Swiss-Prot record:
Gene name in the database record: gcvP
InterPro entries the record matches: GcvP, GDC-P_C, GDC-P_N, GDC_P, PyrdxlP-dep_Trfase, PyrdxlP-dep_Trfase_major, PyrdxlP-dep_Trfase_small
The organism's place on the tree of life at top rank: Bacteria
GO MF, any single term: pyridoxal phosphate binding
Protein name: Glycine dehydrogenase (decarboxylating)
Protein task: The glycine cleavage system catalyzes the degradation of glycine. The P protein binds the alpha-amino group of glycine through its pyridoxal phosphate cofactor; CO(2) is released and the remaining methylamine moiety is then transferred to the lipoamide cofactor of the H protein.
Length: 957
């Protein structure tokens, strides 16, 4: 036996689990691309002056079991008190059937955003259900398929109110003083960059303030008071003021819909529909508006359309509003939303149905009534007479009450003057209420739940009669059918079967990094130690979170070459926004607030200009040369022209064209020479980690897509995380938080997300990935990602020319296949190829981005050579099919490409095509066949006949 014990322990075992090609496959691919080793290939591709001499010191790799044990020990430092803090976050009961069949199911969490609707009908249906829940509860006409959180939804509502307002000369926005403090914080941050004045006052004084374009009210105030705003909204509408209302999704089950009262926009958090608090996220926000404002709405909207056979099918509607098309003119910079969490909330509503939801809401309210009655009976005073689940209780000995609460492992809301806040939820029991009596009144209170129940059951006046809902909700059959676990399990499986996720095939989307989300990485997110913490609990109860976040931040600092990391942004787009705000505030601190020009290469992702616009900057586009690189001559000219007004450049590296630009350091130097900052978009970090870093290259700030490079799953369109890394001079300007002091952060800036650490409960995924891979594995992952992309490029370049290459004809971690010459010759388009790939069992690469008429392929390091060859074989077979069309064997108007994808029913339908059924549906053979459930979507029909709520159930059968 020649192996040492260390070798037998094999601490790096996970590296081989995560990286798809084994050593033999890697060597075969290296031979195919003409490189001797991974290091040799990297040396050929990455510019010498930016290659790291030593890898980042993030430690040795750990096995899955060792890493899980280590993280479990950290998690155990969190203290699981019962939290009645409220403020938009409550404990929940996630039905186990949803936990097991969705949240823990890679068929749901590894899918991508449904830009290819033919392989996304399942989650599109679940999202349509989410929209229907939103419509029913808000009383409005149009709903989106989720935003990032309630506070950012409020900021989006403000921006939308300005877009649709007829009061074009006004820049004043009114916010009621009893909205949640984190909501006000994020609204103020957004308002500053838009040049809006935010007025905060009692809602009843809004009419005292002149020249207001929009108003934000909260139906159930932050301390619990239910407001009947019917008359006020009517008066505001008569003055052409746009009215937005923040609402509690569970309270809406019982309360009058704000839309019925005249509100233009209604939003809130869907967290309490089954999604754990998770120390702040991720949670989906719901957002609804009047039909007349639909084209001004932010975020994605699911619509009902038809497929090529005339069958009902779903798609993302009105995509021309989105940032990847409208760029700086987009309604919002939002890209990743919260699809997985929206679908949990959607299925929570399906499982409970209207009867179950009313029972839950009524139970919460009854227990709140019982608590209120007992406290009042013993002489305590409630600050509000009307409430749903939250009491504001005036107490003489507040310190004593809080001390007794702490001793009982209870968190009360403590930031209210001379009072405490108590928010009940669906997990609250009669035993909990008795414990609250003891905390507030002492052990000898003598109260009995059943006696109090009889009193309040017949004489509850805590909800005004005018505020009680008088219409039916969730009448669609989908909410009234799947209430047994068997039926629910089968319904969820039927949806999952319609979709294509990583558990079936590679998803080669360029710029998306659809890599493995390992089971070991995912396990900790459902641990109660992480899932059940309130984001505003005392810091001593979250020591495990603080340790885990600090370790992850330290690793990211070392991997990026920056000096500090801020974890708050809960998407890549939010990270961009936060990074640009840091640049803006840095310039302002130097009395250079006039610096507002942001240079952006023509190849940039559409989120870049949209984020720059949101940060109050002017976008100036820098040209690219014929090789796709930034044109240095044009850059110098634009930088010189901007002069003292130059704020920054936003650049992606490797470039969005899939190459390592040789002049990246010179780009940074030019911008710095003119006083600007360098924002390096972290979308392509998967080709940097361990090889180079943004800080080493010369950048000042980057966001990191943890849902790309660091293994948080895409969830079908979210969640994501977009923390920002910054150089020391920008560290004082990263987002802060009005409710929680973020340890180690000296910032005085406002928040960009509702929670201080964004979607904190998914950070363990990235912690696990880095811990298990170690420095060695992380570098190797980047190198194999580069190898896989070059292998695909080399094997396909004769059939589909690679549009841009770097030195020695190499690409980075992705490549762009140019379909335009074939399109000119044959009229077969990139869309036809994308849809035909579905018949071969693949999700399409990224279409027409960053160059129209192309396909961008990113295989990631997780795909084996076997899967890469399967994809390559499919692409070569499709090229042969195009040649058949070109040769006239198949007519242009009737061939397997233009008719793709083909569905199962076509096997037994009348067949009049010039190609066989077998060619249509089994081009890659019968084994493991993926069947799309709809044919190609009719996008024009969908947008011309916009319908964004549930259709009759018969349409799905």
């Amino acid at each position: 036996m020649t192996q040492t014990l260390s070798q037998l322990e094999n601490s790096g075992a996970f590296i081989e689990r995560h990286i798809g090609p084994d050593a033999a496959q890697q060597q075969e691919m290296l031979n195919a691309v003409g490189a001797q080793s991974l290091n040799a290939l990297t040396g050929q591709i990455v510019p010498k002056d930016i290659q790291l001499a030593t890898p980042p010191q993030v430690g040795a790799p750990a096995t899955e079991y060792a890493a899980l044990a280590e993280l479990k020990a950290i998690a155990s430092r969190n203290k699981r008190f019962t939290s009645y803090i409220g403020m938009g976050y409550t404990a929940v009961q996630l039905p186990p059937v949803i936990l097991r069949n969705m949240l823990e199911n890679p068929g749901w969490y590894t899918a991508y955003t449904p830009y290819q609707p033919e392989v996304s009908q399942g989650r599109l249906e679940a999202l349509l259900n989410f929209q229907q829940v939103t419509l029913d509860l808000t009383g409005l006409d149009m709903a989106s398929a989720s935003l990032l959180d309630e506070a950012t939804a409020a900021a989006e509502a403000m921006a939308m109110a300005k877009r649709v307002s007829k009061l074009k000369n006004s820049n004043r926005f009114f916010v009621a003083s009893d909205v949640h403090p984190q909501t006000l914080d994020v609204v103020r941050t957004r308002a500053e960059t838009f040049g809006f004045e935010v007025i905060v006052d009692d809602a009843q004084k809004v009419l005292d303030h002149q020249d207001v374009f929009g108003v934000l009210l909260q139906q159930v105030g932050t301390t619990g008071e239910i407001h009947d705003y019917t008359a006020l909204i009517s008066e505001l509408k008569s003055r052409k003021i746009v009215v937005s209302v923040a609402a509690d999704i569970m309270a809406l089950v019982l309360l009058t819909a704000p839309g019925k009262q005249g509100a233009d926009i209604v939003f809130g958090s869907a967290q309490r529909f089954g999604v754990p608090m998770g120390y702040g996220g991720p949670h989906a926000a719901f957002f609804a508006a009047k039909d007349e404002y639909k084209r001004s709405m932010p975020g994605r909207i699911i619509g009902v359309s038809k497929d090529a056979a005339g069958n009902t099918a779903l798609r993302m509607a009105m995509q021309t509003r989105e940032q990847h098309i409208r760029r700086e003119k987009a309604n919002s910079n939002i890209c990743t939303s919260q699809v997985l969490l929206a679908n949990i909330a959607s299925l929570y509503a399906v499982y409970h149905g209207p009867v179950g939801l009313k029972r839950i809401a009524n139970r919460i309210h009854r227990l709140t009534d019982i608590l209120a009655a007992g406290l009042q009976q013993k002489g305590l005073k409630l600050r509000h007479a009307h409430y749903f689940d939250t009491l504001c209780v005036e107490v003489a000995d507040k310190a004593g009450v809080l001390a007794r609460a702490e001793a009982a492992e209870i968190n009360l809301r403590s930031d209210i003057l001379n009072a405490v806040g108590i928010t009940l939820d669906e997990t609250t029991t009669r035993e909990n209420v008795m414990q609250l009596f003891s905390v507030l009144l002492g052990d000898n209170h003598g109260l009995e739940i059943d006696t109090l129940d009889k009193d309040v059951a017949h004489d509850s006046r805590s909800i005004q009669p005018a505020m009680l809902r008088d219409d039916e909700i969730l009448t669609h059959p989908v909410f009234n059918r799947y209430h047994s676990e068997t039926e629910m399990m089968r319904y969820m499986h039927s949806l999952e079967r319609k979709d294509l996720a990583l558990n079936q095939a590679m998803i080669p989307l360029g710029s998306c990094t659809m890599k493995l989300n390992s089971a070991a990485e995912m396990i900790p997110i459902t641990w109660p130690e992480f899932a059940e913490l309130h984001p505003f609990c005392p810091p001593e109860q979250a020591e495990g979170y603080q340790q885990m976040i600090a370790q992850l931040a330290d690793w990211l600092v070392k991997l990026t070459g920056y000096d500090a990391v801020c974890m708050q942004p809960n998407s890549g787009a939010q990270g961009e926004y936060a990074g640009l705000l840091a640049i803006r505030h840095y310039h302002e601190s130097r009395n250079e607030g006039h610096r507002d020009i942001c240079l952006i290469p023509a190849s940039a992702h559409g989120t870049n200009p949209a984020s720059a616009h949101m940060a109050g900057m002017q976008v100036v586009v820098v040209a690219c040369d014929k090789n796709g690189n930034i044109d240095l001559t044009d850059l110098r000219a634009k930088a010189e022209q901007a002069g003292d007004n130059l704020s920054c450049i936003m650049v992606t590296y490797p470039s969005t064209h899939g190459v390592y630009e040789e002049t990246i350091r010179e780009v940074c130097e030019v911008v710095h020479q003119f006083g600007g900052q360098v924002y390096l978009d972290g979308a392509n970090m998967n080709a940097q980690v361990g090889i180079t870093s943004p800080g080493f290259i010369g950048a000042d700030v980057s966001h990191l897509n943890l849902h790309k490079t660091f293994c948080i799953p895409h969830g079908g369109g979210g969640p994501g995380m977009g923390p920002i890394g910054v150089k020391a001079h920008l560290a004082p300007f990263v987002p802060g938080h009005s409710v929680v002091q973020i340890e180690g952060m000296l910032t005085r800036q406002g928040a960009v997300s509702a929670a201080p650490f964004g979607s904190a409960s998914i950070l363990p995924i990235s912690w696990m990935y880095i811990r298990m891979m170690g420095a060695e594995g992380l570098k190797k992952a980047s190198q194999v990602a580069i190898l896989n992309a070059n292998y695909i490029a080399s094997r396909l370049q004769d059939a589909f020319p690679v549009l841009y290459t770097g030195r020695d004809g190499r690409v980075a971690h992705e490549c762009i296949l140019d379909i335009r010459p074939l399109k000119e010759e044959t009229s077969i388009s990139e869309l036809d190829i994308a849809k035909r790939l579905i018949d071969y069992g693949f999700h399409a690469p990224t279409m027409s981005f960053p160059v129209a008429g192309t396909l961008m392929v990113e295989p990631t390091e997780s795909e084996s050579k076997v899967e890469l060859d399967r994809f390559i074989d499919a692409m070569l077979a499709i090229r042969a099919e195009i040649d058949q069309v070109k040769a006239g064997v198949w007519p242009l108007e009737d061939n397997p490409l233009v008719n793709a994808p083909h569905i199962q029913s076509e096997l037994v339908a009348e067949w009049a095509h010039p190609y066989s059924r077998e060619v249509a549906v089994f081009p890659a053979g019968v084994a493991d066949k993926y069947w799309p459930t709809v044919k190609r979507l009719d996008d024009v029909y969908g947008d011309r006949n916009l319908f964004c709520s549930c259709v009759p159930i018969s349409e799905y059968q």
